[in-house]
Amino acid sequence: MGKYFGTDGVRGEANVELTPELAFKLGRFGGYVLSQHETERPRVFVARDTRISGEMLEAALIAGLLSVGIEVYKLGVLATPGVSYLVRTEKASAGVMISASHNPALDNGIKFFGSDGFKLADEQELEIEALLDAKEDLLPRPSAEGLGALVDYPEGLRKYERFLVTTGADLDGLKIALDTANGAASVSARNVFLDLNADITVIGEKPNGLNINDGIGSTHPEKLQDLVTETASDIGLAFDGDSDRLIAVDENGAIVDGDKIMFIIGKYLSEKGLLAKNTIVTTVMSNLGFHKALDSCGIHKKVTAVGDRYVVEEMRQFGYNLGGEQSGHVIIMDYNTTGDGQLTAVQLTKIMKETGKTLSELASEVTIYPQKLVNIRVDNSMKERAMEVPAIAEVIAQMEGEMAGNGRILVRPSGTEPLLRVMAEAPSNEEVDYYVDTIAAVVRAEIGLD
């Protein structure tokens, strides 16, 4: 990670850390870096989620892009994967998404996509950071016809919706509960599943700028669980604020997380001979039960650091077509270049329809080990160096010794927030509580801010 860019672009509290001034510079410098080798006038697509700060940052970012002669296509509210899809298929120079994903409304973020629809390489981010830190802005300042033009492009949303529908199956007879998190999916998910002939009920579809991810969506699926049981739905589908992740709920109201979703899609593709190299790419956060289920089906796995960008890097480098995270980021490279919650939902429901199986039946092959994750607020300067604190390193080693191989511990910094995450898996909830609580107590005593 760089000075400004984290694992998923630039993020911070809107108007405090991520200011309009910074957004303008990101537009100006990012646009320049991503389009300097273009032979024709560059085109950049810009979208946002439903946060109250989105329009403020959008205006500043677009001003920066226009100031270096870029033609900007303004998409309005659209899912993050919609941007990557449109950039790639419409042959744009780049795309920019204004969102803080699953974070609360006070935060926002800016992330760039290259012309291939993928997030930026580290080298490109460092080039933008160098311009941000330069003492003087020496970039060209065109005037008159050299300035960029702004184009409203609402057709982008319709094109993305049509793409999603073309990947699915007729869902006639399937009853679906949707939770669009008062976020970007609130403008598209209803249309997509109605076009697929599903019988739908929707919550989290009334964004007001402040209620995005607020007790709702993929990080808060409790309301969706209740809705599924109340409406006797076959499946519940919960997206996050920018709709790049999906958490599902089965017909009994039980959570089906990213691990189980990846297993279901991976097994389906494997049985059809469509799973590239018969391998799924996942992260260190995936549950032991997920690994055991893959082993039982003869499916291979590759494990990366946490963050969908690392999953995508592994997939691109070695030619895999399915990967993701327990949190619900699922990348299906045959269709899109980034995690896509609505695409994943369409594929999951297609599998249910084609197999005639309930979601609980499809997910039953994965027996999840009890897992506990605690987030501890720490100073940003300490979260990367926690393992250098002797007391923390010692307690982790002690707990791992007590596990004797029957479980695992993972202590890692958040890529987007000032948090240290302490996670453990073990055969019982009592053991998990003991391991996590013991380590967390030491972390709080040594470097915690709470």
Curated annotation (Swiss-Prot):
Its cofactor is Mg(2+). The modification Phosphoserine is found at residue 101. This is Phosphoglucosamine mutase. It catalyses: alpha-D-glucosamine 1-phosphate = D-glucosamine 6-phosphate. One of its GO terms (molecular function) is phosphomannomutase activity. Binds 1 Mg(2+) ion per subunit. Mg(2+) binds at residues 101, 240, 242, 244. GO terms for cellular component: cytosol. Belongs to the phosphohexose mutase family. Activated by phosphorylation. The active site is at 101 (phosphoserine intermediate). GO terms for biological process: carbohydrate metabolic process; peptidoglycan biosynthetic process; UDP-N-acetylglucosamine biosynthetic process. Its EC number is 5.4.2.10. PANTHER family: PHOSPHOGLUCOMUTASE (ALPHA-D-GLUCOSE-1,6-BISPHOSPHATE-DEPENDENT), PHOSPHOHEXOSE MUTASE. Catalyzes the conversion of glucosamine-6-phosphate to glucosamine-1-phosphate. It is an enzyme of class 5 (isomerase). Keywords: Isomerase, Magnesium, Metal-binding, Phosphoprotein.
